[in-house]
Amino acid sequence: MPDDIQTGRRATARLGFVRGGGTSVLADQHVPYPFHITKPFRLYPQRPELITLYLQSASGGLYRGDRLGLDIAMGPGSAAHVTTQAATVVHRSADRPARQDTRIRVAADAFLHCVPDPLILFPGAALSATTQITLEPGARAVVSESIACHDPEGRGRPFDRVELGLGIETAAGAVLVRERARIAGAEFHAPDSPLGPWRAYGAMVILGPAPCLPDPGDVQAAADRTGCRAGLSPLPNAAGLGLRLLAPDGGTLAAGLEAAAGRAFAALTGLAPARRRK
């Protein structure tokens, strides 16, 4: 295919939350295809400023050459839980990887809980995914990314490659955390894979002032009880806590992320997480 022929979609969704009238409001939204959102749900009467929003895909996943973005802005004092309706499939990409960039800004005393379901890498899938988080003083956030692989034909065919990037900085531009990871599908599935026998991977950052953070042992134990192998440690520059999860499959990984995120949610909000149907 000639290089000058564009393939894939170019779209960026924008969600802006503000505090007003004793609650949080989705005051700014731009949700082009293939994105779709539900109306905000209010699941915590004791904390009316905390709302829940489901982000959905109308297209069946990420495809060759896609360039999709998600911008989330939390205004001062606002609080939101943004999640997905289901896992997102990344389809065969050939020589044009799909790209997904998430940019998050959390203002002073705001809270964001953004724990999407795993990205499922099909055979031949190539993906580059980045997450950039900007924090103002007093901001709190729980943000995750996760991948699993699946061959619908059951032949064990690997994905092509995946690249993950994370950046966390202050509103003044000071870098707190920066990391990148890359692995080819053949390495991921190899007998000497750096993941050992595990076939799903997740990462979560729990960000906020030190007195608000959960007990690391409690978070790790909650994830381990689901069948995951979890490890948690402080992030550089006192940014918060960083969790890594390994799991045998995407379902176990999702359960581990939910368990760990629930402990983080409770510590940062003082509330037990409400059941969210999917």
Swiss-Prot record:
Cellular component terms per the entry's GO annotation: cytoplasm
Highest taxon of the lineage: Bacteria
InterPro entries attached to this UniProt entry: UreD
Coiled coil: none
Subcellular location: Cytoplasm
Family in the record: Belongs to the UreD family.
Subunit structure: UreD, UreF and UreG form a complex that acts as a GTP-hydrolysis-dependent molecular chaperone, activating the urease apoprotein by helping to assemble the nickel containing metallocenter of UreC. The UreE protein probably delivers the nickel.
The protein, known as: Urease accessory protein UreD 2
